[in-house]
A protein has these predicted regions:
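Conserved class I S-adenosyl-L-methionine
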Residues: 1-37, 45, 60-65, 117-149, 171-178, 182, ...
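Local beta-strand N-terminus motif with an aromatic residue
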Residues: 33, 88-89, 115
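Class I SAM-dependent methyltransferase SAM/SAH-binding core
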Residues: 35-81, 105
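A conserved beta-strand element that flanks and buttresses the S-adenosyl-L-methionine
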Residues: 92
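Short catalytic micro-motifs in class I SAM-dependent methyltransferases
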Residues: 95-99
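A short glycine-rich, Lys/Arg-flanked "PGG" loop and its adjoining helix->strand segment in the class I
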Residues: 104-118
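Conserved Class I S-adenosyl-L-methionine
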Residues: 162-248
């Protein structure tokens, strides 16, 4: 993970800004947790300002983009958190677990350092139906299904969990993979793709082929004819999930 984000993390904070609706969903999931460790914290998006937070991030490129007045940050790996057992009320991991080299160990570490709950924002690899990957980049689905843990994986680690859906708003300002579902031209922008790890791992051959098809379909109206119904929707279910595991 550190190497990937040292490579793609330059300028990351300009595209990956916290969306207030996802921020509110995370705050609700954290409930009354007073102390939080944010693992795989990146540039610090979604770290609540109304409670004590410690960030953990392995990539120095991301650490350098954190706000000077942000939460204190420790350069470390999710696989070996440098904290005692039950050091925090809650542990938090936002769209990061799929990058961890040893997911089972990292999830166990999240549980070890939390005495209250574990909150994880992730994507369900068993979900399907996003036009971007179905029509243009099916290879991304194959890649993501190899790296994203399933809901059953979380259940095996934590036991009973609560799973909440996060439908993506049409004007989402956090530039993750599904953010631009109603703004298809955005995916043609190299700076947009640079902030999405799936594109960073793409093979040039299928990436260029998919971009060419998308560019053509947007130019001749094929995309709009096929997906006009999307403009009637303010949010879209794309498989993003918030996992909550109680440690009490």
């Amino acid at each position: 993970m550190s190497q990937l984000y040292d490579e793609i993390g330059v300028g990351y904070q300009h595209r990956r800004r916290p969306d207030p609706r996802l921020a509110a969903a995370i705050i609700r999931a954290l409930d009354d947790a007073e102390t939080v460790v944010n693992v795989g914290a990146g540039a610090g998006s979604y770290e609540p300002s109304d409670r004590s937070v410690v960030a953990v991030e392995p990539a120095m490129t991301m650490i350098r983009q954190r706000r000077p007045d942000g939460a204190p940050v420790v350069q470390a790996s999710a696989n070996d958190l440098p904290f005692r057992d039950e050091a925090f009320t809650a542990s938090l991991a936002i769209l990061t677990v799929h990058h961890w080299p040893d997911q089972a160990r990292g999830l166990a570490e999240l549980a070890r350092v939390a005495r209250g709950r574990v909150v994880i924002v992730t994507w369900d690899p068993l979900w399907s139906g996003f036009w971007l990957v179905d029509d243009y980049f099916p290879e991304i689905t194959d890649l993501d299904r190899q790296i994203f843990p399933t809901i059953e994986d979380f259940q095996r680690t934590f036991g009973r969990i609560e799973v909440r859906s996060f439908p993506v708003p049409h004007d989402c300002i956090d530039g993750f993979m599904g953010a631009y579902w109603r703004r298809p031209h955005a995916y043609l922008d190299p700076s947009v793709r640079a902030a999405i790890s799936a594109f960073a791992k793409a093979e040039p051959s299928w990436l260029e082929s998919g971009l060419a098809r998308l560019r053509r379909d947007l130019a001749d109206g094929t995309w709009e004819r096929r997906h006009a119904h999307l403009f009637e929707q303010s949010e879209l279910e794309l498989g993003y999930r918030i996992i909550i595991a109680e440690r009490d």
